[in-house]
């Protein structure tokens, strides 16, 4: 080098002009002054100044001496560093320094000076910046690449720059630092791990949070050098992740944080690292997998991340972790879902399936977080979540765990409020989530008080927010009510009813507290507190808190007065809110932030505060209805047809008239209702009448102008209106007018005189009107009514068949096809029953005569005159009317006493009628009477006969009714411990003697030792005993055993001297005993009480007689399988294994498709007629239900079981059997002239047989709205469905001869459904409910028709009858009708129909709970289950000619 030569030749240092020598001999100030001049000189020099470069070479060398590099003064060091930086610039590309050590010292010196950049306020900062700019621009540090210690230099430089960068620096400082550092990475041969660490450490979250500028600097550097640094980053991760060499760097423990940061900075940095993560996702180390999952959740979920589309294998591998065995990993995956849904809607499809499985996870926290994730995304934008995802939230509203259910319900409520009420995303979004309102209200059918309270809270805050202005609130309620489905409406009605009931309970409590303290009042207060407690969560704590609250009410008059205002019927919504605020304020304690006592009282106040309805609200609601009537409302905008809105508005007002009658007392309200009465829409006028009936008690006194306008309308309605309006008009007059006797007389007289049996169309309304007058004012018209019944009702109507019925093979037709004459006869029967119920006595023997008449109708299969004029559908209607009438009369004690055992047993056979609808409606009426504790206990025994029903859904319905009735009685006994004298009529176990007696007298049970008949008896007994024995409360198994033993010591009171009858009784007892012994392990213990047997049914036990004989044939032993009975209320396990997915909800239409009349009765050789029940072992059913549904009534549990429980194991269906004759000659009708009529027209030996097996449609007059919608579809198939035999008698379908085992298999196995109570308003007219109930059968009729080969059909026929009857309508055996020709065992042909068992059961393998409410009705119409026959054998049944049948 040239300088070197000079250096060697000449050691003299040349200073710039004006600068004297710089040495240690001068002062610091002077040195600084001289150095500044040197800096200026070097600053002005450029690389081309060769002379100056030569001139100042020695100065350059001198400035790099240790004297300067180690000078104590920072100003000196800074100036020297600036000079050195310029020297590197001027002399580039060669530096004047050749010694590697010297170079290292110089660069380490410059690096140290860069620390001065830290203080941006320093007067020297600009000079520090100049230094940085200079070395960055010249890339001076690149000289170090050739040095051995270069790594140390670079590392120190990087550390220095990262440590000094701060928010005081401008963009230029940042840029120069990046330039300086990036040149080292991009132009160097390698990047050491140490150097890499100095960069990456700034990305670690802890450092990142400490120094955001260092993070930004590192980020900018990595972006700039991505391509160059990527191999070194890859190597680092490879060493740590794949080879496990964590010692190579202190950052090894932060690899996953670093990967995330690097991915966010530039995904190219990790091109080779991401495949390594796929490997790590499959690691055996739980914690390691968890770390990777957390990392990838952030990477996939980041807003602009394209990782899922760029790296599909990694995405799929990640999705697999949703099913990881480690709970925290699944939890992490689920939490990630919401970010992913919000930031990447395109991935929702991939996530849906995995979230579906996780929504059924065994871990509560995971199910909970699935809901949170979906709801969070939905609240951001409803379009982010598809219907499947929302459906997962819907399913979880039935979860086993309260926390999960609560989250799901609240989530749906928030979504509903945002998108349906506030229309945050337009009408399409509102339609998408329209189902939420129904679903939330359906939850009110749950047993849990927590669920029901939450529904009430949701309703008040999210569905109809109580803080809305009155008009807006009522508009919201009006359109909500108009768009709810039937079950949601019932739930909402039930909610108001429960709140109203609780309000009255609290009012009663306040009245009791105000009374003077006595032992009686203290007991009454305690009793009332217990009742209120049952309406609050956590009854144990609630009881203590309610006692405390009672004490507060006694002591604090202010709180008591506030509460009195709150429960007053005149309390306004604003007042209610004020009262609640005041009471909670007084009870609160600022020092106690969490106050469980206050929380409980808040629950109570929330339930009783009328926050929606007051007089102003009713007025606003009426105005809203009037707007719809006038056509000025926004009905169409709200998506509700005007007619539907008006009808729903009136229905809503009708319900509120039960719960808030005082709120209707305004002239404006009554005037609007009067206008509604005059409308053409029958339903609207009907509702208006009911509202008047409920609210009109003060009309006479307070609103005389309304009274005078209303009276003529009521008169007109009662004389010429539709039947239901006539009924309500009579009840209105009874409720409103003090001169009711006069009014009734003005109506009764003209109607009575104008009754004309030849004018059938105009008879129905008068009969309904007279019937209700007779019910409400029996004494006023006692004589004319008796004469009317004896002459007109019985002689002219019931004993006359004026017109021949249409010839049809159907067993049931819709209302409009029923002959007018039959409709009149049905009303005539109802009128007689109302007359008797009004009288409430049998002094004139009218009850006895009526019962004989009704049983004669049953005996004659509905054809009272037996002239053969009445069509089969009409006969079905009359049988149903007669059976229902007996059940109605049995609810009145004076008539129950006169119903003979033979009449009771005959009535019981209606539950096995051949027509599906007769069985269905009769069962509902029976259930209604039993569940209200109105029917005596022996009527519950009738349910046992349902075990013989060929249609599985009927058996399921009967079972649920039985469970509900048993629970109702048990609950009643718990709450009324003092009613021990009524134990015999209430204790469910006492149904066993009645059941045994009924089965012993079953006309199907003919041969005492017949195995097949005994197997039927066993099935019927087990149908009842299984539910009774599900819990061995108070040692009930031993009690039942003792009862059965006691019966064997008695004789049948119905025929004490009939040896065969008594033998049957003892045989049935032995069947029961064997069931008890095979299913119970505690039956042999001592019975807690000595049972009392009903004296009407059994003689007194003979103490001298010990009946230890076993009456069962030995072959029966094999039919009693040991094992505990299944519990009736099963709350299944929370979930299936991890891979399971929930079962699809069953649609309304799918459940409506049931077995039809044609398939179940009309053709014995058709598959539906001969279905047996599946052995429960064949049903591979999941019990994995999450939560039961039940009646909304508190404390009344319902049954929830899978189909295998409902379908009891049975090999064969019963054969037709001989019937016990009834001596009709001995029965007299009681009215002299009537006796002859009945006996003349009743052929000798006329008998009634039990018939069996149809599904079909139903009456329209009192039809549920949704059933009407279904009717049109159903009726299309009527011709095929309802074709019974021409001369077929009702009875159970014959068994397959030769011991075949037909089976039935459900096509879709619904999950267990809770029975639901009809949740109408409190105490509606029983008549009204009854009429409505008769309208619930139409929907249940559609079914698959199975083809049977003609050849098989012909084989099933007897040669002697085939010529007489068409092959299309083969009769089933009449019950008890002996066939003249014996039925030998003939060869039979098996026809296989339907799927294999495996196919049917496969659907159920992953069964979760179904949306129990979808399309289901309350307990009065328990949900239907679709059935399909799997394996069917054709049966050989002897046909008989008409003569032989009628012998």
Swiss-Prot record:
It comes from Homo sapiens (Human). One of its GO terms (cellular component) is chromosome. PANTHER family: ANDROGEN INDUCED INHIBITOR OF PROLIFERATION AS3 / PDS5-RELATED, SISTER CHROMATID COHESION PROTEIN PDS5 HOMOLOG B. Residues 1156-1167, 1379-1388 have a biased composition (Low complexity). Residues 1172-1184, 1196-1214, 1225-1243, 1265-1274 have a biased composition (Basic and acidic residues). The modification Phosphoserine is found at residues 1140, 1162, 1166, 1176, 1182, 1191, 1257, 1259, 1283, 1319, 1334, 1358, 1366, 1369, 1383, 1417. Residues 1137-1155, 1355-1372 have a biased composition (Polar residues). GO terms for biological process: cell division; cell population proliferation; DNA repair; mitotic sister chromatid cohesion; negative regulation of cell population proliferation; regulation of cell population proliferation. This is Sister chromatid cohesion protein PDS5 homolog B. It is found in: Nucleus. The modification N6-acetyllysine is found at residue 1136. InterPro entries: ARM-like, ARM-type_fold, Pds5. Residues 1117-1447 are annotated as: Disordered. Keywords: Acetylation, Cell cycle, Cell division, Mitosis, Nucleus, Phosphoprotein, Repeat. The keyword Nucleus applies. Belongs to the PDS5 family.
């Amino acid at each position: 080098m040239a300088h070197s030569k000079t250096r060697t030749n000449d050691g003299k240092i040349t200073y710039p002009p004006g600068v004297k020598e710089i040495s240690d001999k001068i002062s610091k100030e002077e040195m600084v002054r001289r150095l500044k001049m040197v800096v200026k000189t070097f600053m002005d020099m450029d690389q081309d100044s060769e002379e100056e470069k030569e001139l100042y070479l020695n100065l350059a060398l001198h400035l790099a001496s240790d004297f300067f590099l180690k000078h104590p003064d920072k100003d000196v060091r800074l100036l020297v560093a600036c000079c050195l930086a310029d020297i590197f610039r001027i002399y580039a590309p060669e530096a004047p320094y050749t010694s590697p050590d010297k170079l290292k010292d110089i660069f380490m010196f410059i690096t140290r000076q860069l620390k001065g950049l830290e203080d941006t306020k320093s007067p020297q900062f600009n000079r520090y910046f100049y230094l940085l700019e200079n070395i960055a621009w010249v890339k001076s540090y690149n000289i170090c690449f050739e040095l051995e210690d270069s790594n140390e230099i670079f590392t120190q430089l990087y550390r220095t720059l990262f440590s000094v960068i701060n928010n005081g620096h401008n963009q230029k400082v940042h840029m120069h630092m990046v330039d300086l550092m990036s040149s080292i990475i991009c132009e160097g041969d390698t990047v050491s791990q140490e150097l890499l660490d100095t960069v990456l450490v700034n990305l670690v979250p802890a450092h990142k949070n400490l120094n955001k500028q260092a993070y930004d600097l590192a980020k900018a550097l990595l972006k700039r050098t991505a391509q160059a640094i990527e191999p070194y980053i890859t190597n680092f991760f490879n060493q740590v992740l794949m080879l496990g060499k964590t010692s190579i760097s202190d950052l090894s423990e932060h690899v996953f944080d670093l990967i995330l940061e690097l991915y966010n900075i530039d995904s190219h940095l990790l091109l080779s690292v991401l495949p390594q993560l796929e490997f790590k996702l499959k690691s055996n180390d739980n914690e390691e997998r968890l770390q990777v999952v957390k990392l990838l959740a952030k990477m996939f979920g980041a807003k602009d991340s394209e990782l899922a589309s760029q790296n599909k294998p990694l995405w799929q591998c990640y999705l697999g972790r949703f099913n990881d065995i480690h709970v925290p990993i699944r939890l992490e995956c689920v939490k990630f879902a919401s970010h992913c849904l919000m930031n990447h809607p395109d991935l929702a499809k991939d996530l849906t399936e995995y979230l579906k499985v996780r929504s059924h996870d065994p871990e509560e926290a995971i199910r909970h977080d699935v809901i949170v994730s979906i709801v969070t995304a939905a609240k951001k934008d409803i379009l982010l979540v598809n219907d499947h995802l929302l459906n997962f939230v819907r399913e979880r509203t039935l979860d086993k765990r309260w926390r999960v259910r609560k989250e799901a319900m609240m989530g749906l409520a928030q979504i509903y409020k945002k998108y349906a009420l506030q229309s945050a995303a337009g009408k399409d979004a509102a339609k998408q989530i329209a189902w939420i309102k129904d679903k939330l209200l359906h939850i009110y059918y749950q047993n849990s008080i927590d669920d029901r309270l939450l529904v009430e809270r949701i309703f008040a805050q999210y569905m109809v927010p109580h803080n809305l202005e009155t008009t807006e609130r009522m508009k919201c309620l009006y359109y909500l009510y108009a768009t709810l489905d039937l079950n949601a409406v019932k739930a909402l009605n039930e909610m108001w009813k429960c709140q109203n009931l609780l309000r009255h309970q609290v009012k009663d409590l306040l009245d009791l507290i105000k009374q003077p303290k006595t032992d009686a009042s203290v007991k009454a207060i305690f009793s009332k507190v217990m009742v209120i407690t049952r309406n609050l969560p956590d009854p144990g704590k609630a009881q203590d808190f309610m006692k405390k609250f009672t004490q507060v009410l006694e002591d604090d008059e202010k709180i008591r007065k506030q509460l009195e205002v709150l429960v007053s019927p005149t309390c306004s919504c604003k007042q209610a809110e004020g009262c609640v605020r005041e009471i909670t304020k007084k009870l609160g304690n600022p020092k106690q932030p969490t106050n469980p006592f206050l929380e409980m009282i808040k629950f109570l106040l929330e339930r009783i505060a009328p926050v929606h309805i007051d007089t102003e609200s009713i007025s606003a609601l009426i105005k809203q209805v009037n707007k719809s009537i006038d056509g000025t409302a926004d009905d169409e905008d709200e998506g509700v047809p005007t007619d539907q809105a008006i009808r729903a508005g009136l229905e809503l007002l009708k319900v509120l008239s039960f719960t808030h009658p005082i709120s209707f007392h305004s002239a404006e309200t009554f005037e609007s209702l009067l206008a509604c009465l005059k409308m053409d829409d029958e339903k609207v006028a009907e509702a208006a009448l009911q509202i008047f009936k409920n609210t009109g008690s003060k009309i006479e006194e307070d609103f005389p102008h309304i009274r005078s306008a209303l009276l003529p309308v009521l008169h007109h309605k009662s004389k010429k209106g539709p039947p239901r309006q006539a009924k309500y008009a009579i009840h209105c007059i009874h409720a409103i007018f003090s001169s009711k006797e006069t009014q009734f007389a003005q109506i009764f007289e003209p109607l009575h005189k104008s009754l004309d049996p030849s004018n059938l169309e105009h008879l129905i309304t008068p009969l309904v009107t007279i019937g209700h007058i007779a019910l409400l004012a029996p004494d006023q018209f006692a004589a004319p009514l008796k004469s009317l019944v004896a002459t007109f009702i019985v002689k002219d109507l019931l004993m006359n068949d004026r017109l021949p019925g249409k010839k049809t093979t159907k067993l049931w037709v819709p209302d409009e096809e029923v002959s007018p004459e039959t409709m009149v006869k049905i009303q005539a029967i109802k009128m007689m029953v109302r007359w008797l119920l009004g009288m409430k006595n049998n002094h004139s023997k009218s009850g006895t005569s009526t019962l004989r008449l009704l049983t004669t109708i049953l005996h004659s299969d509905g054809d009272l005159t037996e002239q053969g004029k009445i069509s089969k559908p009409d006969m079905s209607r009359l049988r149903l009317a007669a059976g229902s009438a007996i059940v109605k009369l049995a609810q009145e004690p004076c008539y129950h006493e006169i119903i003979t055992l033979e009449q009771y047993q005959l009535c019981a056979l209606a539950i096995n009628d051949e027509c599906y609808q007769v069985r269905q409606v009769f069962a509902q009426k029976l259930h209604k009477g039993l569940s209200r504790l109105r029917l005596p206990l022996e009527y519950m025994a009738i349910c046992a006969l349902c075990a013989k029903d060929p249609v599985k859904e009927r058996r399921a319905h009967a079972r649920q009714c039985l469970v509900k009735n048993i629970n109702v009685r048990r609950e009643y006994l718990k709450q009324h411990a003092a009613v021990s004298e009524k134990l015999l009529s209430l204790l469910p176990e006492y149904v066993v003697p009645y059941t045994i007696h009924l089965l012993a007298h079953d006309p199907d049970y003919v041969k005492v030792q017949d195995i097949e008949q005994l197997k039927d008896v066993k099935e019927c007994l087990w149908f009842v005993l299984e539910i009774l024995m599900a819990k061995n409360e108070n040692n009930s198994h031993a009690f039942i055993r003792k009862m059965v033993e006691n019966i064997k010591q008695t004789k049948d009171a119905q025929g004490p001297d009939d040896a065969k009858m008594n033998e049957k009784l003892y045989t049935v007892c032995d069947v029961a005993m064997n069931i008890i012994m095979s299913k119970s392990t505690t039956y042999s213990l001592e019975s807690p009480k000595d049972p009392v047997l009903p004296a009407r049914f059994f003689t007194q036990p003979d103490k001298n007689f010990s009946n230890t004989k076993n009456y069962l044939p030995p072959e029966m032993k094999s039919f009693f399988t040991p094992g505990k009975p299944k519990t009736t209320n099963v709350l299944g396990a929370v979930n299936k294994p991890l891979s399971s997915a929930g079962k699809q909800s069953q649609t309304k239409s799918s459940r409506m498709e049931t077995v039809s009349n044609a398939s179940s009765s009309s053709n014995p050789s058709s598959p539906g007629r001969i279905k047996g029940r599946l052995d429960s072992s064949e049903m591979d059913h999941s019990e994995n239900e999450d939560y039961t549904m039940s009646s909304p009534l508190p404390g009344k549990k319902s049954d929830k079981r899978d189909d295998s429980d409902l379908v009891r194991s049975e090999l064969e269906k019963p054969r037709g059997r001989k019937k016990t004759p009834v001596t009709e000659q001995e029965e007299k009708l009681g009215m002299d002239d009537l006796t002859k009529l009945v006996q003349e027209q009743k052929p000798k030996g006329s008998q009634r047989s039990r018939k069996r097996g149809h599904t079909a449609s139903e009456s329209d007059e009192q039809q549920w709205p949704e059933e009407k919608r279904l009717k049109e579809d159903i009726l299309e198939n009527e011709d095929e469905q309802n074709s019974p035999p021409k001369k077929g008698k009702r009875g159970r379908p014959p068994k397959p001869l030769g011991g075949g085992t037909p089976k039935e298999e459900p096509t879709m196995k619904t999950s267990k459904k809770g029975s639901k109570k009809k949740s109408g308003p409190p105490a509606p007219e029983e008549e009204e409910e009854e009429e409505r109930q008769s309208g619930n059968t139409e929907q249940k009729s559609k079914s698959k028709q199975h083809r049977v080969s003609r050849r098989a059909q012909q084989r099933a026929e007897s040669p002697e009858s085939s010529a007489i009857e068409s092959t299309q309508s083969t009769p089933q055996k009449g019950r008890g009708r002996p066939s003249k020709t014996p039925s030998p065992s003939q060869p039979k042909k098996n026809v296989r129909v339907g799927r294999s068992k495996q196919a049917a059961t496969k659907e159920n393998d992953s069964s979760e709970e179904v949306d129990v409410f979808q399309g289901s009705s309350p307990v009065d119409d328990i949900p239907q289950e679709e059935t399909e026959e799997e394996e069917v054998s054709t049966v050989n049944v002897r046909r008989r000619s008409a003569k032989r049948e009628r012998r």
